[in-house]
Design a protein with these regions (language model features):
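Short, glycine/charged-enriched secondary-structure capping and boundary segments
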Residues: 21-22, 71-72, 96-99
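Phosphate/oxyanion-binding active-site loops and adjacent basic polyanion-contact surfaces
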Residues: 15, 59-63, 67, 119-127
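Short, Lys/Arg-enriched charge-dense amphipathic segments
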Residues: 5, 28, 55-65, 105-114, ...
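Glycine-rich phosphate-binding P-loop
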Residues: 3-26
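Active-site catalytic pocket residues across diverse enzymes, especially alpha/beta-hydrolases
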Residues: 26, 30, 100
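Conserved nucleotide-sensing/catalytic segment adjacent to the nucleotide-binding pocket
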Residues: 31-87, 93
Length: 140
């Protein structure tokens, strides 16, 4: 079954930073990149091919962001795994729920920590969890 790993968290909690770590980890395993879109603030959208499987990654998860159009793009490109950011409630969560039941949704939470060193450690730990879940899903 197709799967979405959705990282939810409040605004400015580090979701983009965490998913950029995930992106870097998965990029090292990618056979090719089908779609790449970066913007100056660090957000990225990619479709990677890993072990013959299309994987969509969207780091923008704020309301009124490109999340909806990215998920449509990922679905059109038959991505079997989608990794994205959302807020904890509201429109971004609904956008992800709209892809069920075609996609199983695996929710992961982003902690909000004020101390930079703890935040970096937490982001890395959450990224590792998501990377390992993706590897398991992709059989790599």
């Amino acid at each position: 079954m197709k799967k979405i790993i959705a990282l939810s968290g409040s605004g400015n909690s580090g979701k983009t930073s965490t998913l950029c770590i995930v992106h870097k980890g998965l990029l090292s395993m990618a056979e090719s990149i089908m779609d790449e879109h970066r913007i100056d603030d660090g957000d990225q959208r990619n479709i990677l091919v890993i072990n013959g499987v299309n994987v969509g990654i969207e780091t923008q998860g704020d309301p009124n962001s490109r999340l909806s159009s990215s998920l449509i793009l990922f679905k059109e490109h038959n991505c079997h795994l989608i990794i994205c950011a959302t807020r904890t409630r509201g429109s971004t969560v609904e956008i992800v729920y709209n892809l069920a039941p075609e996609y199983h949704i695996s929710w992961r939470g982003q902690s909000s920590l004020s101390e930079a060193s703890l935040r970096d450690e937490s982001n890395q730990a959450i990224a590792n969890l998501i990377i390992n879940e993706a590897k398991s899903e992709l059989n790599v």
